[in-house]
């Protein structure tokens, strides 16, 4: 499932480190990747205690030669025992925030990566390397588009962005066509999901949901009114912070069966919608702190993140207002997203390179130190399947799951 967190980013590199390099312990688990050429060979690790002194000396000399010829600067600091990710360097400006990623089901090695500053990258090797793609119809205008969401079904794909732009492909992304949109669209498009042949579902940050079945040339409303209209019409709903509501969504997530959960812009309540319902259903938050993000667990339940680093799981499955807090080691940094690799294993990511993993369905979480030296916010965790996953961050940070 895809999500969008509208959060401010931080600088990726510490002042003392050149943007071209990242200091880390050399490990087969966390390997810097270059988009245009293979990375330099890693230096040998330290020898085991069973090796003789002469063998140890030979390894040290080899390491010195290797490091002098490579572009890696300084000692490695990643924790190789916990690391399940590798850094993939991208051919983009440092200030770009990565927002979404998707792969073509009919061509599993081919995928696309979106971001701010009209960023569109393509991979044909499963995400190891990426190359820039351009959209001529978008470049003809003076706008600097923010591509928010992408989705594929078969070889058909959709991209939406801000200012309002809709792109469609029928050939796995080889060509992208610009689809005209109504200027009366309420809010900014933040999410799109390819559903069936020539069909998609689109959501705006004001809660409008539209569906199309003819490649986007006509859209039909799946909901009768925007969230603000619903809340202001039902002032006596008992939802804290909902009266005279004029805000937007700060996050929206879709379950595989088409249900939505969204967070109000101020984080003081959340909303849900199921296919067939005429309106969004508002819910009081069950925690004291404001909500940062929400989404769906692999078992059909909900996860909830609060500002400041708290993580909660709903009791049971389905939509509910009952949540239980789960202890996490976030070092005081906020957790921004959760992505499930399987029903039992999930990863959480957040500020200052925080990566957490659970192997028991969320009952306990352990910190992976792989990204500790990446001074960036990690905004989104995306698993295409149990072998292909990515973490997206600000300043062009992309981590690839290597297991």
UniProtKB/Swiss-Prot annotation:
Knocked-out gene: effects: Seedling lethal when homozygous, has pale cotyledons but never develops true leaves. On sucrose-supplemented medium PSII is completely inactive; D1, D2 CP43 and CP47 are present in very low amounts.
Protein's GO biological process: photosynthesis; plastid organization; protein-containing complex assembly
Gene3D superfamilies per UniProt: YVTN repeat-like/Quinoprotein amine dehydrogenase
Subcellular location(s) per record: Plastid, Chloroplast thylakoid lumen
Tissue expression per record: Expression in green tissue, not roots.
Broad class of the protein's primary localization: plastid
Xref: NCBIfam families: PRK13684.1 (NF010237)
Purpose: Essential for photosystem II (PSII) biogenesis; required for assembly of an early intermediate in PSII assembly that includes D2 (psbD) and cytochrome b559. Has been suggested to be required for chlorophyll a binding.
Domain comment (free text): A 7-bladed beta-propeller torus, about 54 by 55 Angstroms, with a depth of about 25 Angstroms and a central pore.
Protein name: Photosystem II stability/assembly factor HCF136, chloroplastic
Source organism of the structure: Arabidopsis thaliana (Mouse-ear cress)
